[in-house]
Amino acid sequence: MSRSWISKRESKILYILLTTTELYLKTGQPVGSKTLKEYECSNLSTATIRNYFSELESEGFLKKNHISGGRIPTDLAFRYYVDHCADFSQSELPESTTRLLNQLPEESQNIVKDLQKALEILGEALQLPTCFSSPRFENDSITNIQISLVDEQRVVVILSTEFGQVFTETLWLPETSSPASVKRIETFLQSYVRKQPPTEILSQKEEDLGMTLYNEVVVRYLTRYCNFSEEDLYQTGLSKLLKYDAFKDPDTLALGLSFFENRRHMCKLLDIGMHRDRPTAFIGNELSTIFGTPNPQCAVITTPYYMNRTPLGAFGVLGPINLPYREIFQTLTIFADKVKDSLTQSFYKFKLSFRRPCPSDPKLSKEPTLLARYSSIKLLPPKETS
């Protein structure tokens, strides 16, 4: 047997593999020899195709559907397909996808809010759950505060910042407060953070309570903002999994949801993706190998996003293993380029900067001066309430 003959046979077998995988992705149905012959392999007999199927099955690339007798690609087949075909761009993206990508935010100082909007647009374009990782952006400031009474002695305080961060904390009240009193305190603090004259006249007790609530929530916010051990993670669109046949099985859906909601797993995949220069796919058993867990029976695709040439984080999508990889890779590439253009303009125009996580830096929790170094947020001294 000559080496050239073996190479030619291998080439045919791999062609059958790629064609079978492509057809399965298009139809979602097991592929039989007759179907494949009609689709792309008219020069081969069905018997020859079945022989190739058997060989690919023995190598772990295909598995037989016992109902129809057709073949279904395995995780290994999808890996081979992604490595050899996913980067080959289609002629053009669907018009609906292009229209959505054109809605991505322009340059602004609302970095986190804009990234979150971009995340929603990406999820809508791909109809998949999406996530992204982000560093912390420096010199942020509070732009709004909201206080909602949970019961007689608990309130939820919500801080909104200039860069689009939202921080929520539940605080206990030292004594019972009425809804009207809490509303007056909220209005007073809103005037303070917006640097406007107060519109509410508070009693001394309300002033003291307002100052206590504000300082408590700001200290908690600054501690969390400055002392962090991993990138921030934002996720959305879990319900989109329900539209896929693979996730109509409750056990498969539970595995996918559990994996996507595991912060450690998603942060690690996004960190890997951030250091690649192109979209990266993690398919089925590969996820099991990385984390030492049961196969989540899903796929995650990540792509880095940049400020100029500096990677800031990564976007990711999660879905069934039989994803339209070519379309997703192309969409993610165009999406990341648009995000890069917007971020680069924003960083230079607004002179923005950012910080990476510091998992081994104990000083942040011990030196109060470090808490304020990276933010323009200040505590409320007693004299400012008088």
From Swiss-Prot:
Q: Which domain of life is it from?
A: Bacteria
Q: Which GO terms describe its biological process?
A: negative regulation of DNA-templated transcription
Question: Which SUPFAM superfamilies does the record cross-reference, listed alphabetically?
Answer: GAF domain-like, Winged helix' DNA-binding domain
Family annotation (Pfam families): HrcA
**Bilayer-spanning residue ranges:** none
Q: Which family does it belong to?
A: Belongs to the HrcA family.
NCBIfam families, alphabetized: hrcA
Name of the protein this chain belongs to: Heat-inducible transcription repressor HrcA
Gene responsible for this protein: hrcA
